[in-house]
Each structure stands twice: as C-alpha cells, then as structure tokens.
Amino acid sequence: LKSGAEEEIDLILKFGNVILIGEAKSIVTTDSSISYYRTYSTLKGATDQARRKALFFSSNIEEIFETFGWTYDPSISYQLFPVVLNSNKIHSGFPINGVPVVDEQVLARYFSSSTFSLISVKRDDKFHHLGWFK
C-alpha cells in the first residue's frame, strides 16, 4: 500500500458489502494419524492468519479499496469474514476457532445455493441428505 503497510492476503472476494478474506493452504495428503494431526494444526494456524489478514484489511480498508479501484462508501457497514481455503477435503465445511474451512467445492456451492450437503446416505438409488453446511 502507499502508506507502507503490507500483508500477504491470498484471497479477497467482494460481494456488495460482504468481503471474504482468505488464507489458502495447500495440503498434500492425510494418510495417517500423524498427517491428520499436522493437517489440523496447519489449518488451526491458518485461522489465526485469516483473522489477522481480516483485521489488516479492516484497518486499511479505504486504501485497499483505492488500490483495487473500488469505491469506498463510509456510510456502508462492510462485513469482513475470514475464511481458510483448503486444497484438501479434510475438515472442509467445518469451522476451526470460529473460522470456516472450505475447499473449492464448498466455496463454489455456497455461491450457487448457500447450502452444501455434508452427510448423505443412498437408499433406493436416491441420496438422502442428513447434514448441511449453510
């Protein structure tokens, strides 16, 4: 930024007054108890990063809007939401430390219908959805 403030933000999505601030994590595999734990630890750390980045964005919102060529309106109450974008499906759809962890399918599905089935069973050649991410 012109002010000299800086932060590496992996994902910024703006929809009206709603702004998602994301930390992206590339996690290769979770094939053992140890790698499962490491994945959770990585994602837990990513939630802290996402929150820090959302705070940075909030503290520098006018300058960031100017940098992106967006019109900043001080009368609008912008809602900033930290999110962790996970390349691996594990933990996607569930929050860690109150921050949603999503993969590309959950994110795409959210914008198409705002719900995503998480738990489904197949009976009589039909899927019955038992749990959703909303």
Question: Whereabouts are the PLM-identified features?
Answer:
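Intrinsically disordered, low-complexity Ser/Thr/Pro/Gly-rich regulatory segments
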Residues: 1-134
